[in-house]
Amino acid sequence: MHIKIDDLTGRQVVSLVNEHLHSMTLMSPPESIHALGLEKLRGPEITFWSAWEGDELAGCGALKELDTRHGEIKSMRTSASHLRKGVAKQVLQHIIEEAEKRGYERLSLETGSMASFEPARKLYESFGFQYCEPFADYGEDPNSVFMTKKL
């Protein structure tokens, strides 16, 4: 698998990000959706990666700089044709390694509290993320859980 920084202009990547946003609208009430659209993902504080198997998009993920010591994982998504093949593990490992290179002391994330998000929570737990209070601009939300990992 090849993981590369992506400018979010390719058809497959745009489609996967839009699919991610649409799925969030099906699983979460509007006030609890924290997924970012293409324009926000192109912001200077965010690095977005796409993961490829040959010419087929396998998944994506992003790292948002909250401050010089703290990063946030955003937009983790696996293409439907690559589910349960270890794509998310590889993308997450790549993001963690990049956060360490940047000198971040902590990496945090927000994900859903509903059953449909259980695979994501289990993945993050397996990498040593622990549940925490809301961080950055997040507030308490019964549809969200917050996790963090010291680097």
UniProtKB/Swiss-Prot annotation:
User: By its UniProt entry, which SUPFAM superfamilies does this protein fall under?
Assistant: Acyl-CoA N-acyltransferases (Nat)
Enumerate the InterPro entries for this protein: Acyl_CoA_acyltransferase (IPR016181), Bact_Acetyltransf (IPR050832), GNAT_dom (IPR000182)
The terms under GO molecular function for this entry are: acyltransferase activity, transferring groups other than amino-acyl groups
Has the keyword Acyltransferase been applied to this entry?
yes
The protein's UniProt keywords, in alphabetical order, are: Acyltransferase, Transferase
Q: Which residues does the UniProt record annotate as the domain N-acetyltransferase?
A: 3-151
**Enzyme Commission numbers on file:** 2.3.1.-
Concerning its family, UniProt says: Belongs to the acetyltransferase family.
Q: What is this protein called?
A: Uncharacterized N-acetyltransferase YsnE
> Upper lineage ranks?
Bacteria, Bacillati, Bacillota, Bacilli, Bacillales
